[in-house]
């Protein structure tokens, strides 16, 4: 019997909604990245994008464990000499794009390369409780009730 490899036509993507209210960012990102990779499915194939589409709502209400909310530092570079910029999660969550904390955490949980960039396009993060994917009939996953450590 030969090893089963999934074909592109056999992939069935589902839509999953995860509520991030009071969720610990690292645990949420690990859970979402596992779904995006397709590791929760028995038909997982490493070289195919067989993961589901994930919608994260209430991303502005995430929590960090310990004192990471003020001590953790995100760096970026403008491209100019001496152009390194830094910010903290507290500043990002109070700013215009609070979803970036969750997106960046999930991005760093995925591998590097073209497949990870393709999988990251299946992630939709919203700061509030509303999303615009009701037509896809997403299933709701109670992330906070999976483990007592998932909430703060």
From Swiss-Prot:
Q: What is the lineage of its organism?
A: Bacteria, Pseudomonadati, Pseudomonadota, Alphaproteobacteria, Rickettsiales
Known SUPFAM superfamilies for this protein? Answer: Ribosomal protein L13
- Give Gene Ontology CC terms: cytosolic large ribosomal subunit
**Annotated keywords:** Ribonucleoprotein, Ribosomal protein
Q: Which InterPro entries match?
A: Ribosomal_uL13, Ribosomal_uL13_bac-type, Ribosomal_uL13_sf
What are the recorded Gene Ontology BP terms? negative regulation of translation; translation
Q: Which gene encodes it?
A: rplM
Indicate the family of this protein: Belongs to the universal ribosomal protein uL13 family.
Sample GO molecular function, one term = mRNA binding
Gene source species: Neorickettsia sennetsu (strain ATCC VR-367 / Miyayama) (Ehrlichia sennetsu)
**What exactly does this protein do?**
This protein is one of the early assembly proteins of the 50S ribosomal subunit, although it is not seen to bind rRNA by itself. It is important during the early stages of 50S assembly.
- Name of protein: Large ribosomal subunit protein uL13
């Amino acid at each position: 019997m030969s090893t089963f490899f999934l074909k592109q036509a056999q992939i069935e993507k589902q839509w999953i909604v995860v509520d991030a209210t009071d969720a610990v960012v690292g645990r949420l990102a690990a859970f979402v990245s596992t779904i995006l990779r397709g590791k929760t499915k028995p038909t997982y194939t490493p070289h195919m994008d067989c993961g589901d589409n994930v919608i994260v709502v209430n991303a502005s209400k995430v929590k960090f464990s310990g004192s990471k909310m003020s001590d953790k530092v995100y760096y970026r570079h403008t491209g100019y000499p001496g152009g390194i910029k830094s910010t903290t999660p507290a500043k990002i969550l109070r700013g215009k794009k609070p979803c970036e904390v969750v997106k960046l955490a999930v991005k760093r949980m995925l591998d590097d390369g073209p497949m990870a960039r393709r999988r990251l396009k299946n992630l939709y993060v919203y700061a509030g409780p509303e999303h615009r994917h009701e037509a896809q009939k997403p299933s709701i996953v109670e992330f906070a009730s999976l483990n007592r450590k998932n909430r703060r």
